[in-house]
Amino acid sequence: MSIPGFGSAEKVNHTASSVTLTIPQSYEWRIEVPFNRILKFKVLTGIVEINGTELANNTEIQLSGTKTYLYSPVTDAVIEYVLVENKDDLSLVSASDEGFVEYLSDESNMDSILNLHMYLESKRQYTKDYNFSSSIDQQQSGPKVLIIGSKYSGKTTVSKILSAYANKMNNTPVLVNLQPRDGVFALPGSLTATPISDSFDVESCNGYGLTTTSGTLVHNPKQPIVKNFGMADFNDNVDFYKLLIEKLGIAVLSRLDQDLNIKNSGVIIDTPALTSKNFDIVESMVSNFLIDNIIVIGNERLAIELTKKFAYKSTQLNIIKLNKSSGCIEVEDRFIRLQQEQTIKEYFNGNFKTRLSPFKTDIELSGLKIYKNVLTKDLLSQMAFLPGGDDFEKDETNPEEDPEKKQLEKYYQAIEDPNSSNLENSIVAITHLPNNDKKLGKDLLNTSVLGYIHVSKFDDQKKRLKVLFPFPGVFPKNVLISTNIGYNE
């Protein structure tokens, strides 16, 4: 495995020829950079943004494995770029990667997004003025925005832009990620909530940045609240997904009450692809986060149906339609998986700009409590073998049966026989919950993630795990959760 920052891409850079490009005002320079290439560029003149984050002039930016665009909002901008071979991540790339794609487009929906931002900013300003002269128990919250839409509609891009623009106005909105496929200041398989107090790091593999690490960072490190879902698709266990939405909603609303600046700034929520068939999930998001603005991207029918279904909240809930950008494209499953692997690698090793020093060691299996998230299909398979009429409900004839344990079994099950087949090459979440917790059932559903380890090897004979930590230290004796997210170094 190559160490980020020690590849030989710099040698190629001296021989590659640079290209100078002018991005006209209000144009987008749309780019698709494969994982086997690195796009290095500088903004020479003008103002250029990536997903709302303004780029510094005459400062080299590196992008790899991304599909995004550069936007010139005010005047014509001039950039200079060069494309070089990616020598750092040979484990992720292959000769079958698509080539570099770039083109200019004047079909931008940035004006609509800017209008939306100004609307939300007016709400924030009203909230600030009101809260300034109000007692604590009468204070209001800034706009809480839920962004929904169909697949490949640009929801994540809009959430980044709105968060970045809000931060430019000295706000600290809470960015909530309810798309477990993506790792937002965490690893894939998680749901997170993060106060955005600084600009995003556009050079990180997913365009967000790093959390608190053992090294120094250019941007302020983010400290998210992380809930472990353990799967990449919310359909793998919808009941568990809705339960985590409820738990994360409680944590976010509590965070708003603790910090007036965050409360004034509000919440911005990114979601997976949802349709009218997922109304129960949308309703869960609206009720648990006290949503007052729903942004529907590129799906007028969905907007109309939501307006009808939320008619009883018409005075409390605004449903806003937003045009889908013509730059939205379908993303292949292989590309998504490569991004997930890169996110995991960056969590442990850092990137070309921030090199981290992960710690590899062996730990004893004895004394560890390891749980595994439950897939709905596996739970239904178990129920199929029960006697007719039986289920997992409490048995009234058995007074010793623990109802909390029964509830836990729908979401987590203890790994009774940890071995190489169920732990090797997996990502394991370390919870805040100590091993000796007496209310394990209830507390495991309420707890958050402290960090992650990677189990690279399991010795079935010696019952020892070879694990990778993000930093050196004593392994905490906390409850562990083995996720469905696999990873090979």
From Swiss-Prot:
Signal peptide, first to last residue: none
Main location: nucleus
Subcellular location(s) of the protein: Nucleus
GO MF: ATP binding; polynucleotide 5'-hydroxyl-kinase activity
Cellular component terms (Gene Ontology): mRNA cleavage factor complex; nucleus
Annotated keywords: ATP-binding, mRNA processing, Nucleotide-binding, Nucleus
Entry's Gene Ontology BP terms: mRNA 3'-end processing; response to xenobiotic stimulus; tRNA splicing, via endonucleolytic cleavage and ligation
Keyword Nucleotide-binding: yes
Binding locations of ATP: 28, 152-157
Function: Required for endonucleolytic cleavage during polyadenylation-dependent pre-mRNA 3'-end formation.
Family indicated by similarity: Belongs to the Clp1 family. Clp1 subfamily.
Oligomeric and partner information: Component of a pre-mRNA cleavage factor complex. Interacts directly with PCF11.
The protein's name in its UniProt record: mRNA cleavage and polyadenylation factor CLP1
Organism per entry: Candida albicans (strain SC5314 / ATCC MYA-2876)
Lineage start: Eukaryota, Fungi, Dikarya, Ascomycota, Saccharomycotina
Gene from which the chain derives: CLP1
